[in-house]
Regions:
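Select transmembrane alpha-helical segments in multipass membrane proteins
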Residues: 12-22, 55, 86-101, 134-138, ...
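Hydrophobic transmembrane alpha-helices that form the core helical bundles
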Residues: 37-40, 59-139, 143-147, 282-306, ...
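TM-loop-TM module centered on a large, flexible mid-protein loop between adjacent transmembrane helices
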Residues: 76-87, 119-123, 231-294, 312-347
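Membrane-interface loop-to-helix entry segments
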Residues: 117, 130-178, 189-191, 230-234, ...
Length: 430
């Protein structure tokens, strides 16, 4: 465990610093990529799905906050797995699954970047090969950026958090004045399948709250500040998402939504803010998605470096290739590109949502096992675990009933993580 005293003495973070980190991590590319997908499923009830997604995130955030407060380190969820589950096959499999989850998320966001780029640069076109070209191109560019620079990643993110928030708030404020109640009134409750599918997808828009736990070792009084920070950050983000969902559904027709699901936020900007506003929102979406790919690649490469130092990856994966890049970096990037080409945005969102939910369910298990050490409430953890389990079962069942091929990729991700972990254990790599 890191020496927290040294960190605390050097510019300790306060409540609003941590809240800013959380909001910045959650309110990013995900909402640009996922709002349209959620609206396709729930239509006028989309805001309800974001509200329930926020409740699930609140429970999960509680477990994260207690663990982060008691075990402050920058290792995040990987460190939690090791502490609560040991260094066995199961812990390693979950770490690998989380790594895969981030890879799928990058592919999803790259798809969103491609959709916005085509919408902006080739107005009216939805050519698949153009979307894929831009998606693969941004992955390649950001991989190169990560290979060349370590420090620019953080600087870029700080600037873009402010830009993203300003654009979204501008859109919401403009939308409030022109809300059309008839478009957002819930005439009939959604089917259970659509509801659970949408909850799974909307939870992905909150998944960034885990980044706050990585800052716990820099907080002056983590036992007090971390739980409050998670509550405030997730609460504010929930209100923002609900407002944005109401605005988009009020101003984008069902026909447009079906046609432009991947760029729904930009479609809402056009009638509200005119062409100039539309351009601003699209540019904001391109910046947000590009920076998210950059930041997530940075996170993936750091996790791989961490796992390599713990001998949890084959030696080849950490072998230097060029500048800061390794063979492992290239292998993961190729895998990301293959997933980007093989799956559409909706399928990628489903895979990432399911694997995120499974990883965060494991965090509940860790928190329950360590509840006495982290001073956590067992009833809250049990309720959170049951809620998360219900969402996972409902989400997987909805995918199965729809015959979604994303289910095959989800099962494949689970099996691949488990098999690789077992093989490495057997070969005494770990």
């Amino acid at each position: 465990m890191m020496n927290t005293e040294g960190n605390n003495g050097n510019k300790p973070l306060g409540l609003w610093n941590v809240v800013s980190i959380g909001i910045g991590a959650m309110v990013g590319a995900g909402i640009f990529a996922l709002l349209g997908q959620a609206a396709l499923l729930m239509e006028a009830s989309t805001w309800v799905a974001f509200a329930f997604g926020g409740i699930v995130a609140m429970f999960s955030g509680y477990a994260y906050a207690r663990l982060g407060a008691s075990y402050p380190s920058n290792g995040g969820i990987i460190d939690f797995f090791r502490r609560g589950l040991g260094n066995g096959v199961f812990s390693l499999a979950l770490s690998l699954l989380y790594l895969l989850t981030l890879a799928v998320s990058i592919a999803m966001v790259a798809r969103a970047f491609g959709a916005y780029a085509v919408q902006f640069l080739h107005e009216g076109s939805q050519e698949e090969h153009l979307i894929l070209l831009y998606a693969l191109g941004i992955i390649a560019v950001m991989t190169l950026f990560n290979s060349l620079s370590n420090h620019a990643v953080g600087r870029l993110e700080v600037i873009l958090v402010g830009i993203k928030m300003m654009i979204l708030l501008l859109l919401i404020i403009a939308g409030v004045w022109s809300l059309q109640p008839a478009h957002i009134s819930v005439s009939a409750p959604p089917s259970s399948g659509a509801f659970f599918s949408c909850i799974g997808i909307t939870f992905l828009a909150y998944a960034g709250f885990g980044m706050m736990a990585n800052a716990a070792d820099k907080v002056k009084d983590p036992q007090v500040i971390m739980p409050r920070a998670f509550l405030v950050a997730i609460g504010v983000t929930t209100l923002l998402y609900i407002s944005l969902a109401l605005v988009v559904l009020s101003d984008v027709s069902a026909l447009e939504l079906e046609k432009y699901a991947d760029t729904a936020v930009a479609q809402a900007a056009s009638p509200l803010l005119g062409h100039v506003g539309y351009v601003i929102v699209v540019i904001g979406a391109l910046l947000a998605t590009a920076s998210a790919i950059n930041a997530n690649l940075f996170a993936v490469f750091n996790i791989m470096d961490n796992m390599g130092s713990e001998r949890e990856l084959p030696k080849l994966m950490n072998k230097s290739l060029w500048r800061q890049s390794t063979w492992g970096n290239i292998i993961v990037v190729v895998l990301i590109m293959l997933m980007t080409a093989a799956l559409n945005l909706g399928s990628l969102a489903s895979v990432a949502s399911a694997t995120f939910l499974i990883c965060y369910l494991a965090v509940f298990v860790v928190a329950i096992r360590l509840r006495h050490d982290i001073h956590a409430s067992l009833p809250i953890l049990i309720v959170g675990t049951l809620v998360m389990l219900l969402v996972i079962v409902g989400f997987i069942y909805s995918l199965w009933s729809q015959g979604s091929r994303a289910l095959i990729w989800i099962i494949g991700s689970l099996l691949l993580s488990l098999i690789v972990a077992m093989v490495m254990k057997r070969n005494k790599t770990v």
